[in-house]
Amino acid sequence: MAALGPSSQNVTEYVVRVPKNTTKKYNIMAFNAADKVNLTTWNQARLERDLSNKKIYQEEEMPESGAGSEFNRKLREEARRKKYGIVLKEFRPEDQPWLLRVNGKSGRKFKGIKKGGVTENTSYYIFTQCPDGAFEAFPVHNWYNFTPLAKHRTLTAEEAEEEWERRNKVLNHFSIMQQRRLKDQDQDEEDEEKEKRSRKKASELRIHDLEDDLEMSSDDSEASGEEGGRAPKAKKKAPPSKGGRKKKKKKGSDDEAFEDSDDGDFEGQEVDYMSDGSSSSQDELEGKPKATQQEEGPKGVDEQSESSEESEEEKPPEEDKEEEEEKKAPTPQEKKRRKDSSEESDSSEESDIDSEASSALFMAKKKTPPKRERKPSGGSSRGNSRPGTPSTEAGSTSSTLRAAASKLEQGKRTSETPAAKRLRLDTGPQSLSGKSTPQPQSGKSTPSSGDVQVTEDAVRRYLTRKPMTTKDLLKKFQTKKTGLSSEQTVNVLAQILKRLNPERKMINDKMHFSLKE
């Protein structure tokens, strides 16, 4: 063999002998560089075949004769294999992997797997130099790649499958727990938001039995509480001879009752207490004493009228003077308050109409002097308060009522609505006739036309409360309450919705309108 170099003059030749018959077979052991194998540190090495796969290639040993044997079993098995093309592989020990143990039990272990196809297209030779300087070349039969074995115990296929199923269960458990935690966090956040909203809107919280009751806002509920809460308050009225401080306490307690009351709470009682109870509660709210019970016309309950008249008879003259002063003072404030409330919402306007109609009559009665005429005769007033007996003073009192009502009508034409005028005129013939069957004056149980008006404020209030469809809005403004036809109501609602331009959302395939506060 010639050594290639810069100059062709220096040539060295070697003799290579290839033996024809060799008893030895040479194999190559390949180690990975990352394993950092150093042969100089090996003190002891043991190499053996791994024959653990021998059981796979073994056939089941069946008896050829005697008990449990089959006739021509081997022939039938061979015929079946030929039919399906099954070729049995023989167990060859030379094809099995090598096990290499270095430095005893405490050392490393390697497993050498035969690499196939290495000697198909190439021939590898191992050169060994002889003492005479010649080289002997031995062909390589097999190539083995050695990899280190892990010292820890590994799982079998069945154990690995069981662990894999367990892994899925564990992962599913973790995912379920994580979902629960996320749900709990979301619920906590929602609860915190609800608490914040409830703190901000604590005054607006109302509990309603029916959907139609939601039409009344917090202001409306107070106004309706004034009308509906008048009946029970008349019975609870204490004798007014105890001074002005108790009156102030009464006012505070009445306000609390108005906040809790709602529309329709006293419908069953309002017929019995319409004429008497409403007037007494109205007088208490305005800070005015109660007028004569006889002038009011029909009485609801006899005991109420008697108790109220007795309490009025017991009043000293000093309190009469104070009450006369109180009568004159709050009238402009009442007008101002009624105007403001009528501008705020339609529902509050309805309650103001009722209160104006009743207060106009009672103010007229209080300005007339029959109160002093009635004082000396306590028994006669008690007798006249009976609902069945006609009163002799009814004609004079009704004429004074009409005169006072006409004066008030001229002063309040600008602020009063036609409904209030109609209510006031209707109370005139009622006061004349001393019948025992009371007529509802407030129009609460039998709604008249025009009680509810389709306004922009009302629609805005409903839409800010919750998303609503046009059908829901039409239910809120019924033709019986508004006094309009269905076509007119639809047109007015369409114009108001155009002006408000609310947000549109599709909920359950239905268009819902809503407004933000």
From Swiss-Prot:
<keyword id="KW-0805">Transcription regulation</keyword>
<feature type="compositionally biased region" description="Basic residues">
    <location>
        <begin position="364"/>
        <end position="374"/>
    </location>
</feature>
<comment type="similarity">
    <text>Belongs to the TFIIF alpha subunit family.</text>
</comment>
<keyword id="KW-0804">Transcription</keyword>
<protein>
    <recommendedName>
        <fullName>General transcription factor IIF subunit 1</fullName>
    </recommendedName>
</protein>
<dbReference type="GO" id="GO:0001096">
    <property type="term" value="F:TFIIF-class transcription factor complex binding"/>
</dbReference>
<feature type="compositionally biased region" description="Acidic residues">
    <location>
        <begin position="343"/>
        <end position="355"/>
    </location>
</feature>
<dbReference type="InterPro" id="IPR011039">
    <property type="entry name" value="TFIIF_interaction"/>
</dbReference>
<feature type="compositionally biased region" description="Acidic residues">
    <location>
        <begin position="255"/>
        <end position="270"/>
    </location>
</feature>
<feature type="compositionally biased region" description="Low complexity">
    <location>
        <begin position="377"/>
        <end position="391"/>
    </location>
</feature>
<feature type="modified residue" description="Phosphoserine">
    <location>
        <position position="217"/>
    </location>
</feature>
<feature type="modified residue" description="Phosphoserine">
    <location>
        <position position="436"/>
    </location>
</feature>
<dbReference type="GO" id="GO:0032091">
    <property type="term" value="P:negative regulation of protein binding"/>
</dbReference>
<feature type="modified residue" description="Phosphoserine">
    <location>
        <position position="224"/>
    </location>
</feature>
<feature type="modified residue" description="Phosphoserine">
    <location>
        <position position="433"/>
    </location>
</feature>
<dbReference type="GO" id="GO:0003677">
    <property type="term" value="F:DNA binding"/>
</dbReference>
<dbReference type="GO" id="GO:1990841">
    <property type="term" value="F:promoter-specific chromatin binding"/>
</dbReference>
<feature type="modified residue" description="Phosphoserine">
    <location>
        <position position="377"/>
    </location>
</feature>
<comment type="function">
    <text>TFIIF is a general transcription initiation factor that binds to RNA polymerase II and helps to recruit it to the initiation complex in collaboration with TFIIB. It promotes transcription elongation.</text>
</comment>
<dbReference type="GO" id="GO:0006367">
    <property type="term" value="P:transcription initiation at RNA polymerase II promoter"/>
</dbReference>
<feature type="modified residue" description="N6-acetyllysine">
    <location>
        <position position="407"/>
    </location>
</feature>
<feature type="region of interest" description="Disordered">
    <location>
        <begin position="178"/>
        <end position="458"/>
    </location>
</feature>
<dbReference type="GO" id="GO:0019904">
    <property type="term" value="F:protein domain specific binding"/>
</dbReference>
<dbReference type="GO" id="GO:0019903">
    <property type="term" value="F:protein phosphatase binding"/>
</dbReference>
<keyword id="KW-0597">Phosphoprotein</keyword>
<dbReference type="Pfam" id="PF05793">
    <property type="entry name" value="TFIIF_alpha"/>
</dbReference>
<feature type="modified residue" description="Phosphoserine">
    <location>
        <position position="449"/>
    </location>
</feature>
<keyword id="KW-0539">Nucleus</keyword>
<comment type="subunit">
    <text>Heterodimer of an alpha and a beta subunit. Interacts with GTF2F2, CTDP1, TAF6/TAFII80 and URI1. Interacts with GTF2B (via C-terminus and preferentially via acetylated form); this interaction prevents binding of GTF2B to GTF2F2.</text>
</comment>
<feature type="modified residue" description="Phosphoserine">
    <location>
        <position position="380"/>
    </location>
</feature>
<dbReference type="InterPro" id="IPR036388">
    <property type="entry name" value="WH-like_DNA-bd_sf"/>
</dbReference>
<feature type="modified residue" description="Phosphothreonine">
    <location>
        <position position="156"/>
    </location>
</feature>
<feature type="modified residue" description="Phosphothreonine">
    <location>
        <position position="389"/>
    </location>
</feature>
<feature type="modified residue" description="Phosphoserine">
    <location>
        <position position="431"/>
    </location>
</feature>
<dbReference type="InterPro" id="IPR036390">
    <property type="entry name" value="WH_DNA-bd_sf"/>
</dbReference>
<keyword id="KW-0238">DNA-binding</keyword>
<dbReference type="GO" id="GO:0032968">
    <property type="term" value="P:positive regulation of transcription elongation by RNA polymerase II"/>
</dbReference>
<dbReference type="InterPro" id="IPR008851">
    <property type="entry name" value="TFIIF-alpha"/>
</dbReference>
<feature type="modified residue" description="Phosphoserine">
    <location>
        <position position="385"/>
    </location>
</feature>
<dbReference type="GO" id="GO:0045944">
    <property type="term" value="P:positive regulation of transcription by RNA polymerase II"/>
</dbReference>
<feature type="modified residue" description="Phosphoserine">
    <location>
        <position position="221"/>
    </location>
</feature>
<feature type="modified residue" description="N-acetylalanine">
    <location>
        <position position="2"/>
    </location>
</feature>
